Design a protein with these regions (language model features):
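Catalytic-core regions of hydrolytic enzymes
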Residues: 1-127, 133-140, 144-148, 208, ...
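Active-site-adjacent mobile loop/cap segments within catalytic or ligand-binding domains
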Residues: 14-15, 89, 136-233
Length: 233
């Protein structure tokens, strides 16, 4: 199950660019929800050649945390792949990173968690820590392994070709991963707050290369498992 972050009234990160049309210069808003959907659709295109693949949303619509979690149960997803675009108050921040669900004490990572988790709607922000710990216990070995396969593919293809900073594989307490209750990763594809990186994120060449890297990483991970041997609740 591929999860394009945010959607609908949940915009995610926002940045603004200048565009000139018919000789008139105007500002245009760029939303994380739209960039995430573009990437997710491409990942699905590559994976569905071999695997049954679903999206939590295929259009710009609001999807609650519970709806995402319920969809994972309904389709009996083996893996949960959440795709996001990063943002920072510093316009110099750059690079891609891959997260798996686990406890940690890194304050820099907590900032990323706060950004992604704060967009959740209503009382879904309150996620039971006991549930999180149970999911971590069940999924962390598989999720960590999946994160390595995905990130290694991104590093070998995207880092060199697009000269992007590799920010590594990290543990994180993301609610969307916790409630999916299965092995999964959350991918931050790059910083839309960085103007140079934003141009890459919006380019068709980057979207193709990045989505193919994710798909290849997932395929490599699945190829290491015996049939019917992907653990989930």
């Amino acid at each position: 199950l591929i999860d394009p972050g945010h959607g609908g009234e949940e915009l995610g990160a926002i940045t603004h660019i200048w565009e000139t049309k018919n000789g008139v210069k105007k500002t245009k808003s760029i939303y994380e929800k739209d960039l995430a959907l573009l990437l997710a659709k491409k990942v699905k295109k590559y994976l569905e050649k071999k695997y049954t693949t679903y999206l939590t949303r295929s259009i710009d619509r609001t999807v609650t945390l519970n709806e995402r979690a319920n969809m994972a149960e309904t389709v009996k997803a083996d893996l949960f792949i959440s795709i996001h675009i990063n943002s920072s108050n510093s316009k110099r921040s750059s690079g891609f990173e891959t997260y798996y669900l686990d406890n940690h004490a890194d304050m820099a990572i907590k900032k990323v968690e706060n950004i992604e988790n704060k967009f959740l709607l209503g009382d879904e922000k309150e996620v039971n820590q006991i549930l999180i710990d149970l999911v971590i216990q069940k999924t962390v070995p598989s999720s960590k392994k999946l994160a390595k396969f995905v990130h290694d593919n991104l590093s070998s293809r995207v880092k060199k070709k697009f000269k992007m900073k590799d920010r590594g594989i990290k543990p994180g307490l993301f609610y969307v991963l916790a409630l999916s209750k299965r092995p999964g990763v959350l991918i931050e594809a790059g910083f839309m707050s960085n103007s140079k990186e934003l141009k890459k994120l919006r380019s068709s060449e980057f979207i193709e290369a990045y989505s193919l890297s994710i798909a290849d990483g997932i395929t490599s991970y699945l190829n290491t498992l015996p049939p019917k041997d992907i653990p989930f609740f």
